[in-house]
UniProtKB/Swiss-Prot annotation:
NCBIfam families: PRK11780.1 (NF008747). The modification N6-acetyllysine is found at residues 151, 157, 164, 203, 219, 223, 233. The gene is GATD3. This is Glutamine amidotransferase-like class 1 domain-containing protein 3, mitochondrial. Keywords: Acetylation, Mitochondrion, Transit peptide. It comes from Homo sapiens (Human). Disulfide bonds: none annotated.
Amino acid sequence: MAAVRVLVASRLAAASAFTSLSPGGRTPSQRAALHLSVPRPAARVALVLSGCGVYDGTEIHEASAILVHLSRGGAEVQIFAPDVPQMHVIDHTKGQPSEGESRNVLTESARIARGKITDLANLSAANHDAAIFPGGFGAAKNLSTFAVDGKDCKVNKEVERVLKEFHQAGKPIGLCCIAPVLAAKVLRGVEVTVGHEQEEGGKWPYAGTAEAIKALGAKHCVKEVVEAHVDQKNKVVTTPAFMCETALHYIHDGIGAMVRKVLELTGK
């Protein structure tokens, strides 16, 4: 009986040793080590706002959609805006200027940023992997004079500096809605989209912007609202957003396409 017990014990020990090994003779701890991966570093994205409200600042739905998609993509976001007066203040219930009222772009943008915002003068491309500009008339009124001067517009000096810094560093830039005119003005020859080039019965009410973009020396690429155009050479990604009169979820989807492409171009 003693001999039997010894034989059984030896076989159990052998079986235990066998089951503790995977093919190739690895223990469970060794197998686990093979599945460990180093977390990918988060892309650091600068979001540049132009106020708060579609007619005199940032289009709020666009800014929110960008933030949601950046969050889903695991990005670290820092929000910026220039510390300058707005061109004017619009009463959004009437769509008309509020006479005698003035507001600051940085202060108004802080509403969207929930107070966590930095002066655009402090934005350096060296500290970020990408920059994104939502639309809204603030891009054409506060970040530039496009709303008044069209193709002869001037771009805010800090906005121009930021666009050039990111471009020269080979870091991606995302712009949606009317904001692509900023890239068209500053980065000559860039490819952008603001959607279609004909109004098509009011579906594309700002289609004339495409001609102004061409007049600035940029290339306009026709895209649907759910699409994003990628200028691979310049690493500029654009989507029409509210340049199109359509359901909000389509605009959200197009912005998602833009954000995903921007994050892909960061390589993170």
